[in-house]
Design a protein with these regions (language model features):
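Conserved activation segment of eukaryotic-like protein kinases, specifically the C-terminal portion
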Residues: 406-421
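Conserved protein kinase catalytic/activation segment
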Residues: 375-392
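Intrinsically disordered, low-complexity terminal regions enriched in charged/polar residues
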Residues: 1-316, 320-324, 329, 337-341, ...
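Short C-lobe core helix of eukaryotic-like protein kinase catalytic domains
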Residues: 351-362
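Conserved end of the kinase activation segment
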Residues: 420-431
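Activation segment of protein kinase catalytic domains, centered on the conserved DFG
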Residues: 335-349
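Catalytic-loop of the protein kinase fold
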Residues: 361-380
Length: 491
């Protein structure tokens, strides 16, 4: 299939094989294929030697990432590779890809036809499509959640276009939609796959509300949808795959994380699991975790080596990180901080967000731990008690004095991390305050340019690129140099 025949993506992709939904409009010639309609993707290569290489896996991952971008509510994606006479079927979800193992399509043609026909006959649930929301008028969808203050369920209509979604596979997959009750905007519905070892965000928000915290979002409703353990139930995982290395200049769809809000978002790099390798499993869906970041270092961009060993978690105890898909509806809705309209508004928003952080820490006894431009919103002071900004997203927060979560993925937003946090020092409130300072620098250096230098071309290469590229130690060293006397003026 040529690139011009595939639409619905910001990047030009050429997919060898795909399975798509039937056109909903009668008379559609089907000449164009849209990523939002793709159900299964496949890669076709001439040589059987390509069947179990990083290059083949990464090519499939690129396709899968495009499917996730076009279908942000997708739970998992089926993919397969046919290399010469060899075939391998894959499933990608937010905890990593896993495969069926390799077989010869000539020697086992029955299995080949069974897999292909199986793809064609799968239900929406078996394909990993959005089955937890219901189609509504004007291309929108509805979802039922549990009310936070009343025992009754609440029916909310979601705006068709997400406010925010992630450009990644192995991640929390955070996606946000405006949520309406009738024609009135109630708040924001946030869908995310969080580790089962972390305390649910709704619990922390309700605890903060009970303790009188000011300046954070209020819970309207919540719902637990499904978990990776549910999706993988019945699978038996074998030993990890050993992938061959082949030269490639492609960036990893597994290691690179990019977020978007509306038309543009800044790049966000999340701290990854220190070691997740592919596994084989019995049944047509088998297991594979993300290869070590270090194994990609010569062929992938934005790869980060972790200096952290997950506390209270033995990487040999579990073959994958069990994530739980939850929907959280909060109020009020706001604009991301980088959409500030004036320097004064930027400073007022940051001031109120810092006040909210102070209240969260001192009154709520909760440490946020993920201060970034993605987690500060601009609000209407006339509607939220005079506050121009609020602090959101407690996915990675923890109650002061509690032990380590033991979650496999110790995540954070790379460019805003405090220097000591990058060097594996325990996270404190001071590190969050340091992150607020980096948010201010980021707004001025990255977003302020196009706001105040209209008519001039923004430099293609930013000095701040080194804030999210390389190992943790390299980023910390470079960032420290920027913060020292003589270095700060350069940025």
């Amino acid at each position: 299939m040529s690139k011009k025949d595939l639409v619905g993506s910001e990047a030009e992709r050429q997919v060898d094989l795909l399975l798509k939904a039937r056109p909903q409009v009668q008379g559609d010639s089907g000449e164009k294929h849209d990523w939002k309609d793709i159900r299964v993707v496949g890669e076709l290569k001439k040589s059987s030697d390509e069947i179990r290489t990083k290059g083949t896996l990464l090519q499939l991952a690129r396709y899968v990432r495009e499917v996730y971008i076009a279908q942000p509510a997708r739970q998992f994606v089926h993919a397969f590779a046919v290399c010469g006479t060899k075939m391998e079927a894959w499933v990608f979800d937010c905890s990593g890809p896993y495969s069926s193992g390799v077989f010869d399509v000539y020697k086992d043609s029955e299995q080949f036809f069974r897999i292909v026909l199986g793809y064609a006959m799968m239900s929406d649930e078996e394909l990993g499509l959005d089955t937890f929301t219901t189609p509504d008028r004007n291309a929108s969808r509805t979802i039922t959640v549990n009310g936070s203050e009343i025992a009754e369920e609440i029916l909310l209509r979601l705006d068709p276009t997400p406010l925010c979604s992630q450009y990644a596979i192995v991640c929390r997959g955070t996606t946000c939609f405006l949520a309406k009750n009738g024609d009135k905007v109630e708040g924001v519905a946030k869908f995310s796959w969080t580790s089962d070892k972390r305390r649910p965000e709704v619990d922390l928000l309700q605890l903060a509300y009970q303790r009188g915290v000011q300046g954070i979002a209020r819970v309207l409703g919540y719902r637990t949808i499904i978990s990776i353990a549910d999706l993988r139930r019945g699978l038996t995982f074998g030993n990890p795959h050993t992938f061959q290395s082949r030269n490639t200049s492609a960036a990893s769809s597994l290691a690179q994380s990019q977020s978007r809000c509306k038309l543009s978002r800044s790049l966000t790099r999340k701290r990854r699991s220190p070691d997740t390798r592919p596994h084989a499993a019995k049944r047509s869906r088998s297991s594979s975790q993300q290869p070590k970041a270090k194994q990609f270092e010569n062929e992938l961009t934005f790869t980060v080596e972790s200096v952290h060993t997950p506390s209270l978690f033995d990487k040999n105890d579990e073959v994958y990180d069990n994530r739980i898909l939850r929907c959280l509806v909060v109020s009020p809705a706001g604009r991301p901080i980088y959409e500030y309209k004036s320097p004064l508004e930027l400073l007022m928003v940051l001031q109120d967000a810092i006040k909210a952080h102070r209240s969260l820490y001192l009154d709520g006894k909760i440490l946020h731990r993920d201060v970034s431009e993605n987690n500060i919103i601009i609000t209407d002071p006339n509607r939220v008690g005079g506050r121009s900004g609020m602090l959101i997203d407690l996915d990675l927060a923890k109650e002061v004095g509690s032990g380590r979560s033991g979650a496999r993925h110790q995540t954070g937003t790379m460019e805003f991390m405090a220097i000591e946090v990058l060097l594996n020092v325990d996270h404190t409130y001071r590190h969050d305050l340091e992150s607020f300072f980096y948010v201010l620098i980021w707004q001025c250096a990255c977003h302020g340019w196009r706001k105040s230098k209209q008519g001039l071309e923004q430099p293609k290469n930013s000095l701040l690129k080194r804030w999210y590229t390389g190992s943790y130690e390299e980023i910390a060293t470079y960032k420290r140099g920027n913060m020292e006397a003589g270095g700060f003026e350069r940025i």
